[in-house]
Curated annotation (Swiss-Prot):
It comes from Schistosoma mansoni. It comes from the Eukaryota. This is Hemoglobinase. It holds the Pfam family Legum_prodom. One of its GO terms (molecular function) is cysteine-type endopeptidase activity. It is an enzyme of class 3 (hydrolase). The keyword Protease applies.
């Protein structure tokens, strides 16, 4: 009798937990039609060395379409300067691995060129028609998926001509939640220090589940960087891993946590992170990326295992080195060598500039108290803007982002923005 009672109590406990989960995250009856799913796909860079970002977005677009997301429910932002770039040996095509399957054809691009910026991105999320193109029209019963790929630095992600700071992004997410613009929201971000967009910032009560390519202090990695005909990298490691995971699985049987754990395992050069409402990990990926049970066709080349991976900030120099190696024209080779020399000098100048700023800061009195995360983010935004104005921008050279961590740490240690900005002005004018 005692054993039966214990068994009954256990069953009741399981049912209670299940009931609580189902109450919080009930699978919509509309799952089959996918009418309640929206996606925003963003490649936040331009320039041929950043080929991989637009290839990632194109690949992701086709996977979402194959899984049943309607084209009118997918919003894409990409500069669109790669497919027909003079440096692309395959005009009108973008590849995401060495199989050379074209992912560019058939992609509907909603925002191109100068329209790819942080302000337009936030307008798209808010459903603000002044964005000038397609915007999210999601409501309280809709599920939304956001994928962003580009460069980053502590507390920001980059666009071709500006940045999106973590605090502004979080403010927008809270706006979407309070205005019932979604039921559940999933965000995947590929960028250096991408974890800093959510760490200590994203609360667990917004029905948002986020994963990032890296933690808050490290680079993310690019992959397929050794193509015999294309001089730059074809994919980002984290991005390729999640896209292929979705491409090759029936998403009605694949949970968010299963995808996260597999992508984390396969992305072995950085530390993939998870933030927000982790209870959502029990939900199926199909609720956000489509429920059509279609994986890769039997006639398709199977996805490749990533190889030849390189830290994302090293890609511009890597691309230039490969261009030099692959050209047989002596005049072109000489010209490329001159460009390489200039880029190396600029890298050294950026490093020397930061060393001088650190030297100035070493003369300042160490603060007695650390800054809160809000204070840190406010400080870094001011400091980054000053550094961009007086010294260098992230768009000029990705390695700038690596030095932003020094400025971020000063803010976190409690130094005021005014003190740090004075040091920047003293060195950069």
């Amino acid at each position: 009798m005692m054993l039966f009672s214990l068994f009954l109590i256990s069953i009741l406990h399981i049912l209670l937990v299940k009931c609580q989960l189902d109450t919080n995250y009930e699978v919509s009856d509309e799952t089959v039609s996918d009418n309640n799913k929206w996606a925003v796909l963003v490649a936040g860079s331009n320039g041929y060395p950043n080929y991989r970002h637009q290839a990632d977005v194109c690949h992701a677009y086709h996977v979402l379409r194959s899984k049943g997301i309607k084209p009118e429910h997918i919003i894409t932002m990409m500069y669109d300067d790669i497919a027909y770039n003079l440096m692309n040996p395959f005009p009108g095509k973008l590849f995401n691995d060495y199989n050379h399957k074209d992912w560019y054809e058939g992609v509907v691009i909603d925002y191109r060129g100068k329209n790819v910026n942080s302000k337009t991105f936030l307008k798209v999320l808010k459903g603000d028609k002044s964005a000038g193109g397609k915007v999210l029209k999601s409501g309280k019963n809709d599920d939304v998926f956001i994928y962003f790929t580009d460069h980053g630095a502590p507390g920001l992600i980059a666009f071709p001509d500006d940045e999106l700071y973590a605090k502004e992004f979080m403010s927008t997410l809270k706006y979407l939640h309070s205005h019932k613009r979604y039921s559940k929201l999933v965000i995947y971000i590929e960028a250096n220090e991408s974890g800093s967009m959510f760490q200590q910032i994203l609360p667990s009560n917004l029905s948002i589940y986020a994963t990032t390519a890296a933690n808050s202090t490290e680079c993310s990695y690019s992959t397929f960087c050794g193509d015999p005909t294309i001089t730059t990298c074809l994919a980002d490691l984290y991005s390729y891993n999640w896209i292929v995971d979705s491409q090759t699985h029936h998403l009605t049987q694949r949970t968010l946590d299963q995808q996260y754990k597999e992508v984390k395992r396969e992305t072995d050069l950085s530390h993939v992170q998870r933030y927000g409402d982790t209870r959502m990990g029990k939900l199926y990926v199909s609720e956000f990326q489509g429920s059509r049970d279609k994986s890769s066709s039997e006639n398709d080349e199977p996805p490749m295992k990533p190889r030849h991976s390189i830290a994302s900030r090293d890609i511009p120099l890597h691309t230039l080195h490969r261009q030099i190696m692959m050209t047989n024209n002596a005049e072109d080779k000489s010209f490329l060598m001159q460009i390489l020399g200039l880029k190396l000098k600029r890298r050294d100048l950026i490093e020397d500039t930061m060393k001088l700023i650190v030297k100035v800061m070493n003369n300042e009195e160490i603060p007695n108290t650390k800054a809160t995360i809000d204070q840190t983010l406010d400080c870094t935004e001011s400091v980054y803007e000053q550094f961009k104005s007086k010294c260098f921008t992230l768009q000029q050279a990705p390695e700038v982002g690596g030095h932003f961590s020094t400025l971020y740490n000063y803010c976190a240690d409690g130094y005021t923005a005014e003190t740090i900005n004075e040091a920047i002005i003293k060195i950069c004018g």
